[in-house]
Amino acid sequence: MIALHFGAGNIGRGFIGALLHHSGYDVVFADVNETMVSLLNEKKEYTVELAEEGRSSEIIGPVSAINSGSQTEELYRLMNEAALITTAVGPNVLKLIAPSIAEGLRRRNTANTLNIIACENMIGGSSFLKKEIYSHLTEAEQKSVSETVGFPNSAVDRIVPIQHHEDPLKVSVEPFFEWVIDESGFKGKTPVINGALFVDDLTPYIERKLFTVNTGHAVTAYVGYQRGLKTVKEAIDHPEIRRVVHSALLETGDYLVKSYGFKQTEHEQYIKKIIGRFENPFISDDVTRVARSPLRKLGENDRLVGPAKKIKEPNALAEGIAAALRFDFTGDPEAVELQALIEEKGYSGVLQEVCGIQSHEPLHAIILKKLNQ
């Protein structure tokens, strides 16, 4: 039972590949990094270490790999035989692997069902990949593929820190993980994936992750940067920053509980668990890395402004947004662009243009007040 996984990077090996291996699949990685492909085929296994006290580890194997750029015939053969295809290549790379997957689907000569799951840090990753794949197929081919191939969306969550290992195949991951899959998107029988959660509606889980993990991480980083702190761990250990982060997550939590019916006590435990992840001393994450791409993260539907617009009194979120607007790290192109926009249009103009917060909205005034404090 073959699982073909696109992306032999840290998340592919340390998260998705490991879970598929534990679920009984023969995992084959597809990647264009020839060094990684050769190493996986030479060693046929790799080590996954948990970033926690004691640093327990396990061997994942046997596994194999192919170069999806040069071994296209082998790729198409595997696609014909695979029971499951997954990806962890990054949102921007999905469109690059779509032509090869389209050709593999075009050549499939089996009536067996196949499901393709994009495990990316984006909303609707599988739907996006499907759209990209279908752009390389004729209408008749699309109809044929749609009869046997499913594209269930999923939400994934696991922190994979910067790696410092002599063994290039070894990967450290945090103990916590979450892989939630929309069961309604499958063709045929739902596959066995140990550790995954299958749900009828993915939206509550996507928003819970985005408005808790991503929001909390961003507020920690932006406020921490303003305080001159270097790492997420240092930032969340600062009492005032911790208060702001916790308050922001209580604000988003109120919206999530009311909108999706999460139990209040369970969601409070979820918030506690998420803040505990930021406190993990075995994960070193610079605030400048977590805070990068402020233009995207200040978007109207993203982790800061998105929930703030849905809440009556988003004071802590407004503080996080104000800190994000002040993010001036010269090593990040978006931060440089953001500061240039502020210089040109002022905070009010940027709130309207970048954040979609118009001058008549109460949130606009709340954020400006925070910026003037």
Curated annotation (Swiss-Prot):
Its EC number is 1.1.1.17. The keyword NAD applies. It comes from the Bacteria. GO terms for cellular component: cytosol. PROSITE patterns: MANNITOL_DHGENASE. It is an enzyme of class 1 (oxidoreductase). GO terms for biological process: mannitol catabolic process. NAD(+) binds at A3, L4, H5, F6, G7, A8, G9, N10, I11, G12, R13, G14. Belongs to the mannitol dehydrogenase family. Keywords: NAD, Oxidoreductase. It catalyses: D-mannitol 1-phosphate + NAD(+) = beta-D-fructose 6-phosphate + NADH + H(+). It holds the Pfam family Mannitol_dh. InterPro entries: 6-PGluconate_DH-like_C_sf (IPR008927), 6PGD_dom2 (IPR013328), Mannitol_1_phos_5_DH (IPR023028), Mannitol_DH (IPR000669), Mannitol_DH_C (IPR013118), Mannitol_DH_CS (IPR023027), Mannitol_DH_N (IPR013131), NAD(P)-bd_dom_sf (IPR036291). This is Mannitol-1-phosphate 5-dehydrogenase. GO terms for molecular function: mannitol-1-phosphate 5-dehydrogenase activity.
